[in-house]
UniProtKB/Swiss-Prot annotation:
<keyword id="KW-0832">Ubl conjugation</keyword>
<dbReference type="GO" id="GO:0003677">
    <property type="term" value="F:DNA binding"/>
</dbReference>
<keyword id="KW-0804">Transcription</keyword>
<feature type="zinc finger region" description="C2H2-type 4">
    <location>
        <begin position="341"/>
        <end position="363"/>
    </location>
</feature>
<comment type="similarity">
    <text>Belongs to the krueppel C2H2-type zinc-finger protein family.</text>
</comment>
<keyword id="KW-1017">Isopeptide bond</keyword>
<dbReference type="GO" id="GO:0000981">
    <property type="term" value="F:DNA-binding transcription factor activity, RNA polymerase II-specific"/>
</dbReference>
<feature type="zinc finger region" description="C2H2-type 6">
    <location>
        <begin position="397"/>
        <end position="419"/>
    </location>
</feature>
<keyword id="KW-0805">Transcription regulation</keyword>
<feature type="cross-link" description="Glycyl lysine isopeptide (Lys-Gly) (interchain with G-Cter in SUMO2)">
    <location>
        <position position="545"/>
    </location>
</feature>
<dbReference type="Pfam" id="PF00096">
    <property type="entry name" value="zf-C2H2"/>
</dbReference>
<dbReference type="GO" id="GO:0000122">
    <property type="term" value="P:negative regulation of transcription by RNA polymerase II"/>
</dbReference>
<feature type="zinc finger region" description="C2H2-type 5">
    <location>
        <begin position="369"/>
        <end position="391"/>
    </location>
</feature>
<comment type="function">
    <text>Transcriptional repressor. May modulate BMP and TGF-beta signal transduction, through its interaction with SMAD proteins.</text>
</comment>
<feature type="region of interest" description="Disordered">
    <location>
        <begin position="210"/>
        <end position="237"/>
    </location>
</feature>
<feature type="compositionally biased region" description="Polar residues">
    <location>
        <begin position="210"/>
        <end position="224"/>
    </location>
</feature>
<keyword id="KW-0238">DNA-binding</keyword>
Length: 575
């Protein structure tokens, strides 16, 4: 015998002693089974409602009868796991822990009890009209002339629950009504009759109207000559079904479920249960692939899409798919051009809040990510991760051909060009190079016979100052700094007022003529050399002499002034 058959809430039909028959009510009689398709059509609110009704029903069975073994479905509902059953065939299926309804009807036929007929629903969207309604709680029992009473051994009252879901009327609101099955006690001191006309559930709280209940009790007990278990009372149905949302508005505002740790309140007990996992650190939902745990089942479902590659959210514009709806929402802003996050300092807008947060650090100069090894700070985590590889010597990017590792993906891409034979950098002599530094060095060697000058970073970190001013003795790292400094010494020698502006314009015109007639550089340069003031020639000679001493390869000869020398004179004139 099934374990659930052993622990049943026995219900005895009340009537003449000779006609007293025993009719056991098991958890299967009042349970609900869903197919996977039907379960998928329920929204989260309906699933929570289903969970609460099932747990409450099982609790009532425990309270009115002997101790029952906990079914598997109850354990799953208590843990909050997703629940559905296999697809139904030609006959109505059920949860593996429950017996098929057809077997239950056969057993009733053998005992001589009237067979049950499944309840039908018409006009239900999403379900066939000729199929049994999938979310009807319990068997749709017709009240017989015999009334129900307790088991003789206990000589107490028993309650039979036959919850039936009423058709949806307005805006998809559901109403659960308790069929008014009459309950009697066969003891000498009968227990007060109980009948709940409107038995509505909101997520975790049972809402009852005390005035309505008391009126129902008075209606049943008001006729002294009538037995409360007769058909006239049993066939009376509740017709005042009220939408759940109308009864729970006060609960939504009150938020009766409060967290004892942080004081945050919630509308529903299920939300409070999930919130408490933040304080306890409980993560009951674990991924079978990687072992990562989550506090909510919905988070686990989203995580599992990483392993399965399922991307149900597809962009209608470009067809790109995403595993999360939030990712699709952010992606759509690329097509619409929407940038809702605007910087209050500069007015620049972004399509993601995280991008705005990174941008704000450019104004504040904040660098919250600090290296624990050397103490260097960074404004982004990606920069910190790249920096940490210099300490750990981690090289995650490995070449498939030779096995050489690199710290950056760009370095790996450049390295792979060697194996592919790709050389994208080409000089004038049609020579090909893999990287730009090699091309630059080649061009300097071919043109000037020397290595290229130091880069900006290399010049900044130089310890020596090779360029010295002959007039004041001040030294500089770069020759351009010395040239700018020499101009400050010769400013007093420059003409002032209108004559200075005229000479500036004439120098610019001469530079323009030289640019337009490159073939006449030599003659014009020679003329410029002959017509230049003596102070200018001396200043140029001093600068060339200094550069010749420090770096003789990079100095252009004075005897044949080039366009650069003419530009130098023009700069001095303009300042």
């Amino acid at each position: 015998m099934d374990p659930e058959d052993e622990g049943v809430a026995g219900v005895m039909s009340v009537g003449p002693p000779a006609a007293r028959l025993q009719e056991p009510v098991t958890f299967r009689d009042v349970a609900v089974d869903f197919t996977q398709e039907e379960w998928g059509q329920l929204d989260p609110t309906q699933r929570i409602l289903y969970r609460d009704v099932m747990l409450e029903t099982f609790g009532h069975l425990l309270s009115i009868g002997p101790e029952l073994p906990k079914p598997e479905v109850i354990s799953q509902l208590e843990q909050g796991t997703e629940l559905w059953v296999a697809e139904r065939g030609t006959t109505q299926g059920c949860h593996p822990a429950w017996e098929p309804r057809s077997e239950s009807q056969a057993s009733r036929k053998e005992e001589g009890l009237p067979e049950e007929e499944p309840s039908h629903v018409t006009g239900r969207e999403g379900f066939p009209t000729d199929a049994p309604y999938p979310t009807t709680l319990g068997k749709d029992r017709e009240c017989q002339s015999q009334s129900l009473a307790l088991k003789e051994q206990n000589n107490l009252k028993q309650l039979e629950f036959g919850l039936k879901e009423a058709p949806v009327q307005d805006q998809g609101y559901k109403t659960l009504r308790l069929r008014e099955n009459c309950v009697l006690s066969s003891s000498p001191n009968p227990f007060p009759e109980i009948s709940r006309g409107e038995y509505l559930y909101t997520y975790d709280s049972q809402i009852t109207d005390s005035e309505h209940n008391s009126s129902l009790v008075s209606q049943q007990t008001g006729s002294p000559g009538k037995q409360p278990g007769e058909n006239s009372d049993c066939h009376r149905d509740s017709s005042q079904a009220i939408p759940i949302t109308e009864l729970t508005k006060s609960q939504v505002q009150d938020k009766p479920y409060k967290c004892t740790d942080c004081g945050k309140s919630f509308n529903h007990n299920a939300h409070l249960t999930v919130h408490k996992r933040i304080h306890t650190g409980e993560r009951p939902y674990m991924c079978k692939e990687c072992g990562k745990a989550f506090s909510q089942n919905s988070s686990l479902v989203q995580h599992e899409r990483i392993h399965t590659g399922d991307k149900p959210y597809k962009c209608a514009e470009c067809g790109k798919s995403f595993c999360h709806s939030t990712h699709l929402t952010v992606h759509r802003r690329i097509h619409t051009g929407e940038k809702p996050y605007e910087c209050q300092d500069c007015g620049r807008a972004f399509n993601q809040n995280s991008s705005l947060g990174r941008h704000k650090r450019t104004h504040t100069g904040e660098k919250p990510y600090t290296c624990s090894v050397c103490g260097k700070s960074f404004s982004r985590t990606t920069c910190l991760f790249l920096h940490l590889r210099t300490h750990t010597e981690e090289r995650p990017y490995e070449c498939n051909h030779c096995g050489k590792g690199f710290r950056h993906s760009s370095s790996l891409a450049q390295h792979q060009r060697k194996h592919a034979g790709e050389k994208p950098f080409e000089c004038r002599q049609r020579l090909i190079f893999e990287q730009t530094p090699a091309l630059t060095k080649h061009e300097w060697t071919e043109a000037l016979g020397c290595d290229p000058p130091l880069s900006q970073d290399e010049r900044t970190h130089r310890s020596d100052r090779p360029f010295k001013c002959n007039q004041c003795g001040k030294c500089f790292i770069q020759s351009s700094h010395l040239i700018r400094h020499q101009i400050t010494h010769t400013r007093e020698e420059q003409p002032h007022g209108r004559s200075r502006r005229r000479e500036q314009s004439s120098s610019r015109n001469s530079h323009l003529v030289q640019h337009q007639h490159p073939n006449s550089r030599k003659s014009s340069a020679g003329g410029a050399k002959a017509g230049q003031p003596e102070s200018r020639a001396l200043a140029l000679f001093d600068i060339q002499k200094i550069m010749q001493e420090k770096n003789p390869v990079h100095v252009i000869g004075v005897e044949e002034p080039s366009v650069g020398a003419s530009m130098l004179f023009d700069i001095r004139e303009s300042t």
